[in-house]
Amino acid sequence: AIGARTTESQIHRELASGISAPIGFKNGTDGNIKIATDAIQSASRGHHFLSVHKNGQVAIVHTKGNPDCHVILRGGKTPNYDAASVAAACKELEAAGLPATLMVDCSHGNSSKQHERQIVVADEIAAQLSAGSRQVFGLMVESHIKGGAQKFTPGKDQVSGLEYGKSITDACIDWDSSVRVMQTLSDAVKARRG
C-alpha cells in the first residue's frame, strides 16, 4: 500500500506502474479520494524514468502500467468506512472510469488512532457485507501478538528491553481480537453468499 502522505508522489506512482502486483493508494489525510483516483489512473499507464538497474547501474526504465491498483479508505478529518462513505467513494471511482470497489483501512483516521476501535470498523464492514454489499473487497488491520505498542528508538533504546510480540510502530489489536475479526468477516461473507 502507498500511504496517504505518499499517494501524490509522482515517483511512487511511476514505480507502482511497473509492479506486477495489486497496489493500494490511500486517500489523503483530509479524506479526499481524488488524489488516490488520480494516482490509480497514473499508475495504470506506462512511464519512463531514471532508476537503478539490478546490477547497480543507472538505467532508463519503461513500465507498461499496473491495471491492478485500488483505493484504500483510511479516514481523514472524519472516518470514511460507513456505508454512505463507501458508496460515495465508489461513485467517485465510477465517475473516474475505475472499478467501484475498494479496500478499507481499519486503523489510522478510521479508528481515530485508537487501535481497539479497529474492531468496531471491522464489525461495520462485516455488517455491510452481510447486507449484500460487494463494494469492499478487503480490509487492512494493524495486528500483532499482543495489543498496543511500545516505544523503541534505534541507537537509544536497548533491544533487550523490548516486550516480545508487541509492535514498535503503530498500536495493534492482539491476536485473539484479530481471530475474532477474521471470523466475523468470514461469517459476513458466508451470509452474503446465502
Locate the predicted segments by residue.
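Active-site-facing alpha/beta catalytic cores
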Residues: A1-Y81, S85, H108-G109, K113, ...
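Conserved active-site beta-strand-loop modules that form the wall/rim of enzyme catalytic pockets
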Residues: C69-H70, A100-L102
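Catalytic-site microenvironment of enzymes
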Residues: E94-A95
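Short loop/turn motifs at secondary-structure junctions
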Residues: L98-P99, Q135
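Conserved, mostly hydrophobic/aromatic
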Residues: V104, D174
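Acidic, Ser/Thr-rich peripheral helices and adjacent loops at domain boundaries
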Residues: K151-C172
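Extended, intrinsically disordered, low-complexity segments
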Residues: S177, L185-G194
